[in-house]
Amino acid sequence: MKNPVLLMVLLALTACQPPDPPAESAAPAVATEASGVVVHLFEWTWADVAEECEAVLGPAGFAAVQVSPPVEHALVEGRPWWERYQPVSYTITGRSGDRAAFADMVSRCQAVGVDIYVDAVLNHMTGVYEGVSTAGTTFGEYDYPGLYGFDDFHHCGLTENDDIEIWDDPAQVRTCELVNLADLRTGTEKVQATLAGYLNDLVSLGVTGFRVDAARHMDPADLSAILARVEGNPVIYQEVLDPDPPSWSADYYPMGRVTEFQYSYMVSDIFQEGTVARLLPGTEGAVWDAASFLPSEQAFVFIDNHDNQRGHGGGGGVVTYKDGRRHPLAMAFMLAYPYGRPRVMSSYAFEDDRQGPPTVDGEAIHRVYGPDGLGCSGPEAPEGWVCEHRQPMVEAMVGFHNAVDGAPLVETWTNGRDQLAFGRAARGFFLLNRSETEPLVQTLPTGLSAGVYCEVVSGGLSVDGQACAGTEVAIGADGRARFEVPPMSAAAFYVDAQVAP
């Protein structure tokens, strides 16, 4: 799929981010800090993830892939996506493939510079009282043969049916059941050792990071004790759905980054209604003044995720692939602006909130690659696998993010409404036009040194480094340039995409 060229630079003249106590004392686990863009290949098979690393993600500069939970999980009628979040055992077998395919994926992705981060379900087991797993294992209520029994679960006794009813009560949230999911007693030695054993098994296969699903529903001391047993010091980011102002997230900072849902909601609102000027500090109604965001070094950010794009997890109203050009523009801003660590969502098309991934026969996942693979439809006419991460604007902005990572915000400009621009010290310059009718036409200071730069969304630097594959701009000795950005478009320049003198 190809989008039309998104930018024309007309001229450049003069210038152009009480529960159980821990089984034993443990220091808080401290995660390795990592930078770079994560992509969530939601519900992809291990074989397809490996192919995508080699063909797309490695060359584009993605740092890591978040993959769906690699566990033996409940087999639910209709095969909804959320059956993957109902473990029966920690055996690596399920809809995406077996252990051998998983190990092959990790090896092949790492060979092209892409890490694998696992979506780890540690808080609970299944929400069905009895059934059969994807591997044929029979399980019952609080009975998982050879793994857990009745005493390995919280039975909170705080509500009539042990389900959470008061969502701002830590005792209920951390010991009662989340929508009937059997809540593990994570303060015990047995459960901690079992969960840490699962994570260490994944680390032994080369996994370097974990998204902790439903972390808000685990006591931070329990989670810290579990992660303290994990080898390799993996990257950790934790799902904590917090109100504004946040009152829960800080408890999880010692273990790693925390999902910043307020960012998703507020940035989405702005791209829906159009006043993107509010995305820059110091402007009237600036989003940074209107919400209590987490500190940048603790925040894990995204425009949409697999829950809130379906209205789950406090979601609804976020920008998704169904919102046309607003979605890649929002992701472009996220990748350009210095706040948090970003994750890009890669979806499949869905009509209802429980619909599972594309299948061959209602059971097996229909692959992206292979002779019978569906490929990627793109968001323009979504069907099957949407693959938002392959959009030229998104791929180009991954390179921009990598080039400017760590550089402060400089040279900000807005028209007060639907257009903005900013630099990242002496590393790059970004422009965004949310107007549906008017081009962005301005002569602006960029913070970049004089030279000829390639606009990366329209093509970037040619292979030989001697010319631009797309549009070029000449920046003058005073660091200024004249730009024209068409409606509903973005443009980006950075020093690594500069034509050799």
Region annotations inferred by a language model:
Residues Q17-P19:
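Bacterial signal peptide processing site
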Residues E24-V38, E52-G58, F62-A63, P69-V88, ...:
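Active-site-proximal helices and loops of the catalytic beta/alpha 8
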Residues A12-A15:
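C-terminal motif of bacterial Sec signal peptides marking the signal peptidase cleavage site
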Residues T186-Y198:
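Alpha-helical scaffold elements lining the catalytic groove of polysaccharide deacetylases
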Residues T32-G36, H73-S107, T138-R185:
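Aromatic- and acidic-residue-enriched carbohydrate-binding clefts of CAZyme catalytic domains
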Residues K2-M8:
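Sec-dependent signal peptide recognition
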Residues E24-D48, L178-T188:
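Boundary/entry segment of secreted carbohydrate-active catalytic domains
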Residues C176-E189, D219-L227:
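Active-site cleft segment of glycoside hydrolase catalytic domains centered on the general acid/base Glu
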